[in-house]
From Swiss-Prot:
It comes from Staphylococcus aureus (strain bovine RF122 / ET3-1). PANTHER family: TELA-LIKE PROTEIN SAOUHSC_01408. Pfam families: TelA. This is TelA-like protein SAB1262. InterPro entries: Toxic_anion-R_TelA.
């Protein structure tokens, strides 16, 4: 930001006025150019001695222009509120921060299903949110471009106001120099003549003319002071205009930086982060597929080994196991032996039964014989 002193030192007419008190400002006429001196002489002739009304109007047009200029400056400052620009920039920063690339960098254990479904869903959600924010950022960008256009116009307008203010300063400086030149002329030439004439005359009006001239010189001195005040206002206005311009320029540069740097960088970084996340998920998916393939190969190899062992074992076995043959033979022998025993028991029982039957038959015959004998005797 340019300091007030630099504006003052940079002005071409500042060298004509010393750094004493404002009311005691003196003119360094030797630093005037020939053209400026001609202008001063012309302006000085506008001051007619004892013309109080003309003295009151001396430089008043410039002061009126200064007053109008001050109102224009006030309107410019009041109508250009930079608050919305700051709010728009803050809104932009808020939108840019609402989607954090770190959200794409979550390292958590995941299964194959999570990688292909949940992770994909998470990326899509963030991508959808990023698209929404990007659309909002684009709308904010349009607002910022409008603000930048207004700021650029304001800067150009302030340049015009600065040039006008500089012209007021230049003109007031010449009017002050002309008035001071006229004052010196009246004090050194006209007033002594009137004083000498009054001393040599007995006419009281000559004495009144001396008093009137002294009062006119006093009014001229006060008029010079008023013009110096106006000039000082113009001098102080210059850095104020530049400060407003600097603020507008800084805002315009900030907006341009946001539009041309921050926003494209944000979009690039989000695209890069999303691409890296997709790559990482692809690698994780490939790793999961590889791990699953290895697990399947290992399981299949283990199953093949078990099947081979069992097959070889079965191949080495006979159709009928020896133990089975032994157990079968033992069962057959036991069956034969039990059958023989049963047959022997059956034979013995039959023999016993035959003996009993023979005995029964014999008993029956004997009984029958006994029954026939008594019948014959009777």
């Amino acid at each position: 930001m340019t300091e007030n002193k630099s504006f003052k030192e940079s002005h071409p007419l500042d060298d004509f006025i010393s750094d004493k008190e404002l009311s005691n400002t003196t003119i360094q006429k030797e630093k005037l150019t020939i053209e400026q001196q001609k202008q001063v002489d012309t302006i000085s002739k506008q001051i007619n001695p004892l013309d109080n009304e003309g003295l009151l109007a001396f430089g008043s047009d410039l002061q009126k222009q200064m007053s109008q200029f001050s109102h224009q400056m006030l309107d410019e400052v009041q109508s250009k509120d930079v608050g919305p620009i700051g709010d728009t920039l803050s809104d932009l920063m808020s939108k840019l921060k609402s989607v954090n690339p770190n959200e794409l960098n979550t390292d958590k254990p995941s299964m194959l299903k999570r990688i292909f479904s949940r992770a994909k869903s998470s990326i899509n959600e963030i991508f959808s949110r990023m698209q929404s924010v990007s659309a909002q950022v684009d709308r904010i960008t349009i607002q910022l471009q409008k603000h930048q256009t207004h700021l650029t116009r304001d800067i150009e307008l302030l340049d015009t106001l600065y040039d006008k203010n500089k012209q007021y300063f230049d003109d007031l400086s010449l009017y002050i120099i002309a008035a001071q030149q006229k004052k010196l002329q009246l004090e050194n030439e006209k007033l002594p003549q009137l004083q000498q004439q009054a001393q040599q005359s007995t006419n009281q009006m000559d004495i009144q003319q001396v008093a009137d001239m002294q009062q006119f010189i006093d009014r001229l001195d006060k008029r010079i002071y008023d013009l110096q005040l106006s000039r000082q206002i113009a001098l102080q206005t210059a850095p104020q205009i530049r400060m407003i311009q600097n603020v507008n320029q800084a805002l315009a540069e900030k907006i341009q930086s946001s539009i041309l740097t921050s926003i494209p960088l944000w979009k690039n970084q989000m695209a890069i982060a999303l691409t890296l996340m997709r790559q990482r998920n692809a690698v994780a998916a490939q790793r999961a597929v590889t791990d699953t393939t290895n697990d399947l190969l290992t399981a299949n190899a283990e199953m093949l080994k078990q099947n081979a062992i069992e097959t070889a074992t079965e191949n080495e076995r006979g159709i009928v196991d020896l133990d089975t043959l032994k157990r079968t033979q033992r069962n057959i022998i036991e069956t034969i032996e039990e059958t023989l025993i049963i047959q022997q028991h059956g034979r013995e029982e039959r023999q016993l039964a035959e003996k009993e039957l023979q005995q029964l038959e014999q008993d029956l015959k004997s009984h029958l014989v006994n029954i026939k004998g008594p019948n014959k005797q009777s």
